[in-house]
């Protein structure tokens, strides 16, 4: 690993630590998303709190903060796997932001952005599986958990060499959904 790639990983984490949800809520004079609704600083909760536009802008912000570091590394000829690792770091930053006491969002939008940028056709399957699971069970948490679990396996089918970073990506999002897993098990 050279110095630039190491710095790119740090930059990815710091970019991911920027909370689009908190910024959008401040711009729209909305309550802090960490204190209302699901208490999660993510696009879904901002949509609940502030409506479609606020939720959409949060989603766009999450996409941009994830995509920009990844595209930069890729354009500098570090390759797909390096770009994926930078994407993993942006998701870690989103979920555990240094600027907000390591209490961030669940990372689903950022995770899907990473997958879409690295393996575009694969993203259609991932988004489709998320939507199908949401439609079937009616809970976004279940859709996010199922999607996180299948990402490494679908990814292995398309790009076996990316299996390890895709596993890392999934583990980060599953860690942030652990309380949802516990709640789902209690309901059964």
Predicted segments with their positions:
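Membrane-embedded alpha-helical segments of multi-pass transporters/permeases
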Residues: 21, 70-71, 135, 152-157, ...
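Interfacial segments of multi-pass membrane proteins
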Residues: 47-50, 73-76, 93, 108-137, ...
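Short, non-helical or kinked segments that cap or interrupt transmembrane helices
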Residues: 31-42, 100-112, 139-146
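Alpha-helical transmembrane segments and their helix-entry boundary regions
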Residues: 54-56, 83, 111, 123, ...
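Loop-to-transmembrane alpha-helix initiation sites
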Residues: 124, 140-147, 158-172
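Cytosolic, membrane-interface loops and tails of multi-pass inner-membrane proteins
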Residues: 22-55, 178-188
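Alpha-helical transmembrane segments in multi-pass membrane proteins
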Residues: 4, 8, 12, 17, ...
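C-terminal ends of transmembrane helices
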Residues: 21-24, 93-103, 130-137, 177-184
